[in-house]
Curated annotation (Swiss-Prot):
The protein's role, per its UniProt record: Binds to type II regulatory subunits of protein kinase A and anchors/targets them.
Protein name: A-kinase anchor protein 14
Subunit structure: Binds to type II regulatory subunits (RII).
An MF annotation (GO) of this entry: protein kinase A regulatory subunit binding
Pfam families, alphabetized: AKAP28
Amino acid sequence: MSETQNSTSQKAMDEDNKAASQTMPNTQDKNYEDELTQVALALVEDVINYAVKIVEEERNPLKNIKWMTHGEFTVEKGLKQIDEYFSKCVSKKCWAHGVEFVERKDLIHSFLYIYYVHWSISTADLPVARISAGTYFTMKVSKTKPPDAPIVVSYVGDHQALVHRPGMVRFRENWQKNLTDAKYSFMESFPFLFNRV
């Protein structure tokens, strides 16, 4: 009889354990589901970001101009082409810019013509802007390429190291705004340095 009771109680315990294992979640399965959810969310976020990028490029395609060739190049034409590029790329009319030729560097196989573009926003309160941002343009004219080959154009922002190429990277006005805002914040932090006349 005790043997029958033991086997009956063993069966009851097995059934209790089976029922408990069905009602209690398995921690390994839960961790796996959490990891799977995280991967799925990351994937969905990447897809959404990519879709937003495609829509933005459809609405605002890369804007560029037809840059002059080696045979057409002059310093004055370089100034005009930079103006033309920005008139096509900059949508907000509040930005004022001026282009000036800085220098010509003679390298072994080419000449580098460097231009500086000043950016500022004038307002009714302050018609002459106290703060400006800048962009350095470099036009590379090769000594060895044929006259009908296009020149190589690149630009970098003030205090930046990343080189951009027109037609490959969209010029963003907020780069200039961020720089002018940072300069303005710096000037406000040290008014005793900048309020002198």
